[in-house]
Amino acid sequence: MSAACFAKRGHEVVGVDPDERKLELMRAGKAPVVEEGVDELIGEVIADGSLRVTSDAAEAVAATDVSLVCVGTPSAPDGSLGVQYVERVTEEIGAAIAAKDGRHTFVLRSTVVPGTTLGVVKPILERIVGPVGEKYGLAYNPEFLREGTSIKDFDAPPFTIVGASDERDAQAVEGIYAGVEAPVHRCDISTAEAIKYACNLFHATKITFANEIGMACQTVGVDSRKVMEIVCADTKLNVSAKYMRPGFAFGGSCLPKDLRAFTHMSRVRNAPLSMFEA
């Protein structure tokens, strides 16, 4: 989907995928996923030639200046992150960079734990191509797209995060977002990786919080949706940057007491609140 959105914004894009069935669909101007507007968008950019697709990574690298790597990072049985696809693609792109004339920017977009780009991707590229710098650059640029609204999210993201090895690569990444109305935050590569996880974990926390409030309210006959509607109307404290500083103390005369009372109320009604109990 990102490939089509970048093509729509005037870039020449070469999409790479090992699945020939997906490639054939896209060559026919059809999306390999079901989502509003994507079929039409892919049909448009395939027809005008701004997007073409291939299964050959070397072909794509030779024809472009920047590689955006978006591959799966499945969970291992122990919960750790599987980076086998990242490693495989890095090997392919590294070989292509070594063989091409000119400099190339390798940008990882997959969600990976902090340290992965520098600890997994960088050593592979250095082994194949050489040191980061003259021949290629390295960056991390997470995407913030939700299923079902990905085109809208691409056009109006909350921000763009760019973690890069040097100024040239930061500018290269920023350049592909020209025209996207969103603030750009530059940082180091590992910080960029951590930001993506912090965002996802915050979303998970919000969902859990809302569900636990809902469960507790149900036990005492309170309309939890009304509660959350008014809670979210407070943008000074509740929906804001307040209390979001790492290391901020939890204590005082109210918060611990109120937490104990609310969790006890729910617990005795057979609705323990796991997040708050923790």
Language-model region placement:
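NAD(P)+-binding Rossmann beta1-loop-alpha1 motif at the extreme N-terminus of oxidoreductases
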Residues: 1-30
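ATP-dependent carboxylate/acyl-activation modules
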Residues: 2-5, 259-277
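N-terminal glycine-rich dinucleotide-binding loop that anchors FAD/FMN and/or NAD(P) in oxidoreductases
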Residues: 30-51
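Short acidic-hydrophobic, aromatic-tinged amphipathic segments that line or gate anion-handling sites
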Residues: 52-56
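An anion/phosphate-binding loop that grips the pyrophosphate of nucleotide cofactors and donors
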Residues: 63-64
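Redox-cofactor binding/interface segments in oxidoreductases and associated redox assembly factors
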Residues: 67-69, 108
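Rossmann-like NAD(P)(H) cofactor-binding subdomain of soluble oxidoreductases
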Residues: 74-144
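Internal alpha-helical scaffold of NAD(P)-dependent oxidoreductase catalytic cores
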Residues: 121-239, 265-272
